[in-house]
């Protein structure tokens, strides 16, 4: 039986340096062992890892075509402990260059969330869920 855990999420990016600047310098995520010239960047998250890898190389590694546009059918989420924390994280992302997709607001399921897109268009939800502690 497979253990229910996601250990690494790798985002295919069009410009590694731009994405590194967004995640490391803008959002403040610590890049693990990154050296100039590396083709991949890893960020240690609490309980998992986030990787950035050139989109064409990631597609080649997975033996699929790199073309494609629009919604990919997946979003990433960062959950916080309060509405105020959602607003603070969202503001940090926007100041780092994120594109606002949906401003944080009260949502139908009783929580509070908003969406932004990173420089490559990957959608991130920043949310507070009063019913489940996902922090």
Where are these regions (language model features)?
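Short phosphate-engaging motifs
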Residues: 18-19, 85
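Conserved beta-strand-loop-alpha-helix junction that forms the acyl-donor binding cleft
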Residues: 13-16, 108-109
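Major-groove DNA-recognition helix of helix-turn-helix-type DNA-binding domains
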Residues: 27
């Amino acid at each position: 039986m497979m253990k229910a855990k996601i250990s690494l999420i790798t985002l295919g990016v069009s410009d590694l340096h731009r994405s590194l600047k967004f995640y490391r310098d803008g959002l403040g995520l610590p890049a693990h062992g990154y050296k100039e010239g590396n083709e991949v960047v890893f960020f240690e998250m609490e309980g998992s890892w986030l990787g950035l890898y050139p989109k064409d190389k990631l597609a080649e590694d997975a033996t699929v075509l790199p073309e494609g546009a629009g919604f990919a059918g997946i979003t990433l989420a960062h959950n916080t402990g309060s509405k105020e924390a959602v607003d603070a994280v969202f503001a940090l992302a926007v100041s780092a260059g994120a594109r606002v997709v949906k401003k944080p607001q009260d949502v139908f399921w009783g929580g509070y969330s908003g969406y932004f897109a990173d420089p490559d268009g990957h959608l991130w939800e920043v949310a507070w869920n009063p019913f489940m502690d996902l922090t």
